[in-house]
Amino acid sequence: MDNAVDRHVFYISDGTAITAEVLGHAVMSQFPVTISSITLPFVENESRARAVKDQIDAIYHQTGVRPLVFYSIVLPEIRAIILQSEGFCQDIVQALVAPLQQEMQLDPTPIAHRTHGLNPNNLNKYDARIAAIDYTLAHDDGISLRNLDQAQVILLGVSRCGKTPTSLYLAMQFGIRAANYPFIADDMDNLVLPASLKPLQHKLFGLTIDPERLAAIREERRENSRYASLRQCRMEVAEVEALYRKNQIPWINSTNYSVEEIATKILDIMGLSRRMY
């Protein structure tokens, strides 16, 4: 019997709701269900909390199925309103805090917006992350080769293999200064490592992709073009992989990995520190 059903899932917080989303998604991924996600950040007063409660109740009365509610709310009066709803409510942070409180014999001091908000203690980290994002945008797709020595990692690969989204994820999620450099069709007749990258070989990391997947992605961008042909994609991938092997550049095939997985593998292989924000 197939127990998979459609469920409405709420992620609610008096802050950004990022924590509720991340932990809630992790939990829901364990179940064979199709979900409709509703994220409601900054539920900071009773009026908004009552509106959220009404939204949860309306879905319950429409579907006859209790919405799942993952919440992270500091103020008890706001929590109380959400708990009065027809949803199945789970305080995802408290589920972890309570046993830790017992283990450490220490009372928590919850403060709204502490996880992702700005305060004097994390302002320098925030500025560093913004600087990493600015750097990554300025060094996307080989736009600029200046200050490459300031990069923490330089991603290489053919067009449309995932360099840009991975670079941006590294910058936004971990504050990593990630440049990326494309190998284009004109490079393939005599593909060599550019002179500007040779002194930085310890920072280079290659991405590759299955030619069939690459062709499908390129076809969406330039239909019926040589650029998107399977023959061209096979040739480019083969040449780039040979370059990686020749120059002993670490690399992975991005075909079956999400951006999050690719970024995590890069951090691990390159020994880069994970800095969460």
From Swiss-Prot:
GO MF assignments: ADP binding; ATP binding; phosphotransferase activity, phosphate group as acceptor; protein serine/threonine kinase activity
Binding site for ADP: 157-164
Highest taxon, organism lineage: Bacteria
UniProt keyword Kinase present: yes
Keywords: Kinase, Nucleotide-binding, Serine/threonine-protein kinase, Transferase
Reaction(s) this enzyme catalyzes, per UniProt: [pyruvate, water dikinase] + ADP = [pyruvate, water dikinase]-phosphate + AMP + H(+); [pyruvate, water dikinase]-phosphate + phosphate + H(+) = [pyruvate, water dikinase] + diphosphate
HAMAP family given in the database record: PSRP (MF_01062)
Identification of the protein by name: Phosphoenolpyruvate synthase regulatory protein
Species of origin: Escherichia coli O7:K1 (strain IAI39 / ExPEC)
